[in-house]
């Protein structure tokens, strides 16, 4: 079973994501704070990390940079409402596996990336 770490400042979106992933047979741990998610990922159980760019305690780019310093290289997918091209290019440069806009059909796009 895939274990997904999801971090986003929106409680509504965390619940929505957890429900979606559960329906797909995945275990999901949700966090509001990036620091808590980094600690969970460092435990080594995560198959994927799904993150927004607005977190309760840090920005999404800072969170991604922190993840990249961990010894395990867990794939990261960004699900965001931001469509700023410069910001999205910076995320690609940080090595994210995929960027999905919340305004689009994010469930279908996420399913393709996760292969579910």
Which residues does each PLM region occupy?
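Two-component/phosphorelay signaling modules centered on CheY-like receiver
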Residues: 11-29
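Acidic, metal-coordinating helix/loop segments flanking the phosphotransfer/catalytic sites
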Residues: 30-48
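Acidic catalytic/metal-coordinating carboxylates
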Residues: 33, 59-62
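Active-site residues of response regulator receiver
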Residues: 52
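The feature encodes the CheY-like receiver
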Residues: 56
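Short amphipathic alpha-helix used as the core "switch/output" element in two-component signaling
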Residues: 61-72
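Alpha4 helix (beta4-alpha4-beta5 surface) of REC/receiver domains from two-component response regulators
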Residues: 62, 82-100, 104-108
